[in-house]
Amino acid sequence: MSEELSKKHTTRLNKLQKRLRREVGSAIADYNMIEDGDKIMCCLSGGKDSYAMLDILMNLQQRAPIQFEIIAVNLDQKQPGFPEHVLPAYLEKLNVPYHILEKDTYSIVKDKIPEGKTTCSLCSRLRRGTLYGFAQRIGATKIALGHHRDDIIETLFLNMFFGGKMKAMPPKLLSDDGANVVIRPLAYCREKDLEEYANLREFPIIPCNLCGSQENLKRAAVKDMLNQWDRQYPGRIETIFTAMQNTAPSQGVDREQFDFVSLTRDPNAPMRGDVAEANLPAFDFLDIANSGRIDLDAAKRIDIVNTYEV
């Protein structure tokens, strides 16, 4: 690599590194993901996202005003062709505590699920159960997963289109049994930034041989849709994520999130909101039911039809 290219490489890496660290730090602070004395079980798959997550968390660990542990964990599901030597060699160089769990969930899924049927549900349950159980065994207080902002948005649309739910991936989650807290430190990070960062840092990426399941095909379709939107309307993805952080249950239709049934008017409420902001003089209201007129203030009456006629 020439000196000029090396300088550009370093400059770009430093700039990207600062941005990602800032975004991870903001997500951690906003959702109180990491607290003093935490033992973080950092789940590694060998992909770009989990490598970046571990790298950034280890850097923050050195700079943070609080003390927390990091333990890297990989689940070897015995998928054919998985290079078992890559992660141990990498983690040894980092001098980070780690565990490689071996559980042949691949064979279980192949045995239980008929050919051609989606394996995602069973596979994710087995993986989640193994990781949750191991977290409790080592006394981990938080489980860190490498999902990023794009994953969160894609999951929202997947659930909307194919599940009929407004549901995504929360940056922080309490497991159903209440025993584990899951955090997603990359929640504010863009996938394209993580991909570039992984290339610049030369992480030993383990290729992901996708199973070709229906869920993965659907996710790919949603990703293509969002990428097309982003090309056509730059900034739309950022706006979608901002909208997810600014929900208004009272302006929706979900009766579980807002008590529409009990809504009643307050006859003594002061004039405010839309009525107060309108600041229009009084005018005649047409009483359709009685074909009559209700005079409010004859002195300030205006002809509403003529005034607003186009």
From Swiss-Prot:
CDD domains: TtcA-like (cd24138)
Keywords tagged on the record: 4Fe-4S, ATP-binding, Cytoplasm, Iron, Iron-sulfur, Magnesium, Metal-binding, Nucleotide-binding, RNA-binding, Transferase, tRNA processing, tRNA-binding
Motif PP-loop motif boundaries: 45-50
Cofactor note: Binds 1 [4Fe-4S] cluster per subunit. The cluster is chelated by three Cys residues, the fourth Fe has a free coordination site that may bind a sulfur atom transferred from the persulfide of IscS.
Catalytic activity field: cytidine(32) in tRNA + S-sulfanyl-L-cysteinyl-[cysteine desulfurase] + AH2 + ATP = 2-thiocytidine(32) in tRNA + L-cysteinyl-[cysteine desulfurase] + A + AMP + diphosphate + H(+)
Cofactors: Mg(2+); [4Fe-4S] cluster
Pfam families, sorted: ATP_bind_3
Main location: cytoplasm
Binding site for [4Fe-4S] cluster: C120, C123, C211
GO process annotations (BP): tRNA thio-modification
Pathway: tRNA modification
Enzyme class name: transferase
Single Gene Ontology MF annotation: sulfurtransferase activity
Assigned GO CC terms: cytoplasm
EC number, UniProt record: 2.8.1.-
Compartment annotation: Cytoplasm
Free-text function comment from the UniProt entry: Catalyzes the ATP-dependent 2-thiolation of cytidine in position 32 of tRNA, to form 2-thiocytidine (s(2)C32). The sulfur atoms are provided by the cysteine/cysteine desulfurase (IscS) system.
Misc note: The thiolation reaction likely consists of two steps: a first activation step by ATP to form an adenylated intermediate of the target base of tRNA, and a second nucleophilic substitution step of the sulfur (S) atom supplied by the hydrosulfide attached to the Fe-S cluster.
Family statement: Belongs to the TtcA family.
Oligomeric form and interacting partners: Homodimer.
Protein name listed in UniProt: tRNA-cytidine(32) 2-sulfurtransferase
